[in-house]
Amino acid sequence: MSASPISPPRQDWARLVGESIKQHGVWHTYSKLLEARRAYPDDLSLRGYVEILRNNIVKELLAHPKGVNAVPKLSAEFLTNFDRFNLSAQEGYLISLIDGRMDISKLMILSPFDPFTTLFNLAKLQQERAITIPQ
């Protein structure tokens, strides 16, 4: 008698992601999907939803009235308590480029990262309140 391997239950990511976005917003859903990726590292549909959310986050950043011409500034909270922020190397590099005069399009040119990664990291810094993008 051979035992067939029991596959783990398949998640309904479409429903879970949709409900989470409605109830908690994009950033909370993104962090929960990152946690789920650690639990289900081989789930390709989960990876797809992570990328869809990353795209939505960048779209929200670019929906700013000034778009890529907006000038990010370091927040007062970051300047007074910067060690509270657990920045990645990419985020730290982008922070070092922000001088309050350079717009996002110039940051994308100066950044060694691809434009999407640069925009996503700027959106993440804005979400964490390390930078502000005035209207």
Give the role of each language-model region.
Residues 1-60, 83-135:
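Long, charge-rich, low-complexity alpha-helical segments
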